[in-house]
């Protein structure tokens, strides 16, 4: 594999939540301004992350950690991802894992077959990432979708909630690196969904009150199809100063699954229709695991 010099930027589409990933050394102090530049170049971008990959450059024996320090060669981490605001992002984790496979030329040396889908054609590749805001390595499972260009089905094992509690007449799900407020139709705050300026003011105020690394407002309502929900995500990240009505929000989807499973005390599997498409979440309070499922597509690459 040839070595790439300088900075490159890849644009990926995980269920409409357009994500830019920068490869190369960018000091943490310069990441917000680099992210702002990319968002000016590609206004459809909703978030920017910075990645280092083990083995993507033949000369690279280890990858720097999310704060720019040298990582241990034997750590087992294949990708390190730091978001521009230092928050955790599930869709960016999915995107970084997909980009890693793309860079490695779909070398399936890390392949493991998911037990519930044992046939060879259903083999998934596991990628382990260190992600800003997450205390433990994040596992992503990917399977390439044939004849769809560089596109993958993906599953992310989401970090556990650190707390689920009432907030006004809503539910607050505290997570590593970001928190989410689930706003259901019966809430007196649900009207904020149709008052964008008031909603954006509220998410900033509540984020400060909660001292959160980032805060999402997840407006949740029943969809027409049975057992399906419609969700409209608004996310504020103080570290990058961004407020976005996102096309999809992976961590917000996971938070909704965690909220429902904590409420029912049993395994919950939900399909959430979001502006950019559908995400699925499976949350099991018995095992404590929450898995998010979606797709990710590589759409563009350019030099910075």
Where are these regions (language model features)?
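Membrane helix-loop-helix hairpins that form the core translocation module of multi-pass transporters
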Residues: 151-159
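A glycine-rich beta-to-alpha transition motif near the start of alpha/beta enzyme domains, typified by
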Residues: 1-152, 181-304
């Amino acid at each position: 594999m040839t070595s790439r010099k300088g900075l490159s930027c890849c644009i990926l589409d995980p269920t409409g939540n357009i994500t830019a990933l920068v490869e190369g050394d960018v000091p943490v102090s310069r990441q917000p301004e680099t992210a702002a530049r990319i968002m000016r170049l590609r206004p459809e971008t909703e978030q920017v992350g910075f990645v280092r990959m083990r083995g993507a450059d033949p000369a690279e024996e280890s990858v720097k950690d999310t704060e720019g320090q040298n990582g241990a060669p034997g750590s087992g981490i294949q990708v390190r991802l730091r978001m521009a605001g230092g928050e955790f992002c599930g869709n960016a984790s999915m995107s970084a894992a997909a980009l890693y496979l793309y860079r490695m030329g779909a070398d399936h040396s890390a392949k493991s077959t998911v037990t519930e889908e044992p046939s060879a054609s259903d083999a998934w590749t596991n990628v382990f990432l260190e992600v800003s805001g997450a205390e433990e390595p994040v596992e992503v499972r990917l399977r390439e979708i044939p004849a769809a260009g560089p596109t993958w089905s993906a599953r992310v094992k989401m970090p556990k909630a650190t707390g689920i509690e009432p907030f006004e007449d809503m539910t607050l799900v505290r997570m590593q690196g970001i928190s989410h407020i689930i706003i259901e139709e019966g809430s007196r705050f649900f009207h904020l969904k149709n008052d964008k300026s008031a909603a954006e003011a509220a998410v900033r105020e509540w984020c400060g009150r909660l001292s959160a690394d980032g805060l999402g407002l997840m407006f949740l309502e029943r969809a027409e199809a049975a057992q399906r929900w419609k969700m409209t995500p608004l996310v504020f990240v103080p570290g990058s100063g961004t407020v976005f009505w996102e096309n999809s929000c992976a961590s917000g989807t996971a938070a909704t699954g965690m909220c429902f499973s904590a409420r029912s005390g049993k395994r919950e599997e939900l399909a959430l229709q979001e502006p950019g498409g559908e995400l699925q979440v499976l949350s099991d309070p018995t095992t404590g695991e929450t898995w998010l499922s979606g797709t990710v597509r590589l759409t563009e690459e350019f030099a910075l």
